[in-house]
Regions:
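Bacterial N-terminal signal peptides that target proteins for export
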Residues: 1-9
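Mobile cap/lid helix-loop segments that gate and shape the active-site cleft of serine hydrolases
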Residues: 251-302, 323-331, 339-344
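C-terminal motif of bacterial Sec signal peptides marking the signal peptidase cleavage site
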Residues: 16-18
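Primarily recognizes the serine-hydrolase "nucleophile elbow" in alpha/beta-hydrolase
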Residues: 205-268
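Loop/turn elements at helix/coil->beta-strand transitions in domains of secreted/extracellular proteins
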Residues: 135-139, 157-162, 219-221, 242-246, ...
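Cap/lid segment of the alpha/beta-hydrolase catalytic domain
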Residues: 141-213, 253-262
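Bacterial signal peptide processing site
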Residues: 20-22
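Alpha/beta-hydrolase-fold serine-hydrolase catalytic core, especially in secreted/extracellular enzymes
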Residues: 25-124, 129-134, 307-311, 316-402
Length: 402
């Protein structure tokens, strides 16, 4: 008779722990882990099918199945990135790190030189580090320095370094096509929108931070934020660079978190036909009005590109132009990607009214603090944030059927 192996409860628990799947990373050492994947088929506008509901963010473009395991997400992520660049914002240039050099001009001014084909673009960033040895987490503020429009005390009291991203040194928010700083390096990229160029600039800024000696920075824990058009900027940058651990998109509206399809049903809000085309490819106009249903992707998938890293979206329904009902639908849909991988609490959204544009109300401070504490400081705190009481009457089944 064969002997029976008996495991004590502690030994069995240890064995099960050892066999369990590793926790999904909160950031990566590479800008784009999906860069090696082949570009999927990208049909012309006339060849695209009509889809009234939001596309399934997990479904592979070739119809071969769904990305049900986290290990499959990298491939699906590559497809969504390709679609967003091809149909909306244009190609984000792939610039080798060897083209980037960094130096501190003084205690707080970081100078970043990006040289391509003998031409140089320079970014001047303000870097403020807490006193002490560190290493300190980092938050990049798009456009307006520090932590963007977020409350400074939340970051100052937690010893978090702040880095500014002066977007105008890469591309103006009004863009003259072919005559922007980035075109010194890439004169052929006249069709790209700012939401391709600005994330490129953020990535070069991160390259520079990686080069600094004795920086006292913890570059495994980088956050990015911005509000309004800079909230869109932060979202696009966080979606496109996987070295960013936490993306905080404050009131990003249409072109940011809001799903284009839903926005088209909401009246006088930012839609494909009513947006700033300095930010997008001119050809995106083809998807205006009823043609929005031909888009092979939508912005719940832009949000989902941040997965498995952390994303927090703040909305402000008092400003109709932001199309926050569309933002809510998009966030609910995107969060299902994190949920599929057992990490739904890495994606949060909070829609609060009765406050000024880009002024985070006191009620939302604890939600922000929780995400900062967990994903920048590594604390074990709950981050289950799904607040949108004014949109509870939304018929989600109209948009989400997967």
């Amino acid at each position: 008779m064969k002997p029976v192996l008996a495991l004590s409860i502690p030994v069995l628990a240890l064995a099960l722990t050892a066999c369990s799947a590793p926790e999904a990373p909160i950031s990566f050492s590479e800008e784009n882990t999906a860069a090696a994947y082949a570009v999927p088929a990208l049909p012309s506008f006339d060849e695209l099918p009509v889809l009234e509901t939001l596309p399934d963010p997990l479904a592979f473009a070739d119809g071969s199945g769904r990305a049900l395991k986290l290990r499959d997400w990298e491939r699906r992520r590559a497809e969504i990135l390709a679609q967003l660049q091809f149909y909306e914002v244009g190609t984000k240039p792939a610039t080798p790190k060897e083209c980037v050099s960094a130096r501190m001009e003084n205690d707080t001014t970081l100078v970043v030189d990006v040289t391509v084909n003998g031409e140089t673009l320079t970014i001047h960033s303000t870097l403020k580090r807490p006193e002490g040895e560190g290493p300190f987490p980092v938050i990049i503020g798009c456009g307006f320095g520090g932590p963007g429009s977020l409350p400074r005390p939340i970051f100052e009291t937690r010893d978090i370094a702040t880095v500014s991203f002066p977007f105008w040194e890469v591309m103006s928010h009004t863009q003259t096509r072919g005559n922007e700083p980035i075109n010194k390096l890439y004169p052929e990229l006249t069709e790209i929108g700012a939401y391709s160029a600005w994330p490129w600039g953020v990535s070069r800024l991160i390259d520079a931070l990686e080069q600094l000696r004795d920086s006292r920075l913890d570059l495994r824990r980088i956050a990015i934020t911005g509000c309004s058009f800079a909230g869109k900027m932060a979202l696009w940058a966080g979606a496109m660079d996987e070295r960013i651990a936490l993306t905080i998109a404050q009131e990003p509206g249409g072109g940011g978190a809001a799903a284009w399809r839903v926005s088209e049903t909401l009246g006088e809000v930012e839609t494909v036909g009513r947006t700033n085309y300095a930010w997008f490819k001119e050809s995106m106009r083809d998807f205006s009005e009823e043609n929005v249903s031909r888009m092979p992707m939508d912005h719940h998938e832009l949000c989902a590109l941040v997965a498995p890293r952390a994303l927090l979206v703040f909305g402000n329904p008092d400003y109709p132009w932001l199309a926050d009902r569309a933002g809510y639908v998009s966030c609910v849909a995107a969060r299902r990607v994190w949920a599929q991988y057992g990490i739904a609490d890495r994606m949060g959204y909070s829609f609060q009214d009765k406050h000024m544009h880009c002024a985070l109300p006191q009620e939302e401070w604890p939600e922000l603090e929780a995400f900062v504490d967990r994903f920048l400081l590594g604390k074990d705190v709950p981050t289950e944030v799904t607040t949108a009481p004014m949109f509870e009457d939304t018929d989600l089944s109209q948009w989400i059927n997967w």
